[in-house]
Amino acid sequence: MNLKQRIFRNSSLEMISKIVGIAAGIFLSPYLIHCLTKETYGLWVLIGSVVGYFGFTDFGVRIATGRLVAYYRARQDAAKVNHTINTSLALLTASGFVVTLLTFVLSPYFGRLFHIGPNVLHVPTAVFLCGFAVAIGLPLTVFEGCLAGYERYDFINIVEIFMIIARVGLTVWMMQLGYGILALAAINFALTVAGGSVKLLLCYRVFKPLHVAMEHIDRSTIRDTYATSIWFLILAISVRISFFTDNVVIGYFRTTGEVAVYSIAGRLAQYALIAVNAFNLVLMPVSAAYDAQADLSKQRRLLLLGTRASFAAAIFMATIFLAYGRRIIHIWVGSGFEQAAIVLAILTFPMITQASQTTTLIVMQGMAKHKNLSLIYLAEALANLVLSLILVRPLGIVGVALGTALTNTLSSLIVQPIYVCRVLSLGVADYYRKAFLPVLLATAPLVALIVGFQYVWLPQRFITMAVFCIFSAAVYFGAVYLIFFTKRGLTRVSFAT
């Protein structure tokens, strides 16, 4: 199976999983707002945003595990694969204990910290369950890393799809019975354990020599893992600050109702990035294998292929958001969220730039050349946080969105491309010309067609809007595939560097 076939198979499965997840989110968000009220839904989003920081105690080990497994697999070194998995499992089990302690400390004070009234019940228990889910889930993520290292995204995504379906079913059931955020926290905990356990069993099937035992914990592997993972951690913290701290800033300085409004726009932008990442995540084992072979020309080819696909996908999402965003939000969650359309329009620009650089991040991670890129992301994230803190008081949630947009766009359009081109010995002008210019020229007529269609017919209901978006996506991505990924494409561009 060649590169394009492997990428197509894995990215297709990843995309299906993400589509199911996005569909579930599209259904559950307005449903939970209706069942819980806007303020309580905002509280649930806030709990998830805060507890999500506990995941940083993995110190990037999960992602490093996938990278190292792919690397040693390419070298056919089963012993090192075993050492990597066992060592990572020990490290993340220790992290789980740390998260449990942090959860005990935070739970009683969460309501006081974010000015939650005493009339909202079970907040400490819900926070504890969410934190404990992170603690239990940390060591289980090692086995997902193993599956990713072996490029078994089919197993990963089948499990994820079943977990998503179960989450939707259980959520609807609990809401119908009249339960609140405590039930949501319990569902999250149960499914975290169930999904991780299934991936553990699948890992045994994929890597038959796997033997979980203390004797396989290796000190040299600890050094290798942390040498790789610490920069994954900085990346994860930076991304979290850039895209998820906004809810915490708004929750602290404003209200949970405004958290709910911002989260609707942020969720749409996040869905777009998830869709793009579905393609790119499967590239890291490929890049790691090329790194093991010391093949720089293939890394350049992989970068250009991934960037063009990511940028084309981002342009489609941006077109839909800018032309139809206000209508989509109104159809989706109803009245009371009008300001979310303004926030979405602002967040669309960092969504495009961030999506266009997703392949850069993945390739640098695969090559273990992401140290400097991590520092770039960290500087961007800190600037974003400072701007958001400055702008949240005078401009509210719009100011928070502007802080994200300004810093991310500057970093993704200028700083990151310069760095990756230097690492891969690729001319910056060649990079822009081969990765971005053909996509802009080829997709311009398609974008004009989608935007102009609103003057002919504007969808008024959820089902008609969904059909319109699906039809537009089919036409757009079908044309993009014919143009860029077939031998007879009209504007086929050479990958020669």
Place the predicted regions along the sequence by residue.
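N-terminal membrane topogenesis motif
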Residues: 1-26, 79-87, 121-124, 151, ...
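Interhelical loop/hinge segments that connect adjacent transmembrane helices in multipass membrane
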Residues: 1-7, 199-243, 286, 291-301, ...
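Signature of the first transmembrane helix
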Residues: 3-71, 96-104, 133, 163-168, ...
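Membrane-interface junctions at transmembrane-helix termini in multi-pass inner-membrane proteins
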Residues: 4-11, 135-160, 177-182, 203, ...
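Transmembrane helical elements of multi-pass membrane transporters/channels
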Residues: 9-25, 184-199, 203, 219-289, ...
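Helix-loop junctions and terminal segments of transmembrane helices
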Residues: 59-75, 89, 148-149, 207-211, ...
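Hydrophobic alpha-helical transmembrane segments
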Residues: 124, 128, 158-206, 224, ...
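Membrane-proximal transmembrane or re-entrant/amphipathic helices at the cytosolic face
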Residues: 421-431, 449-497
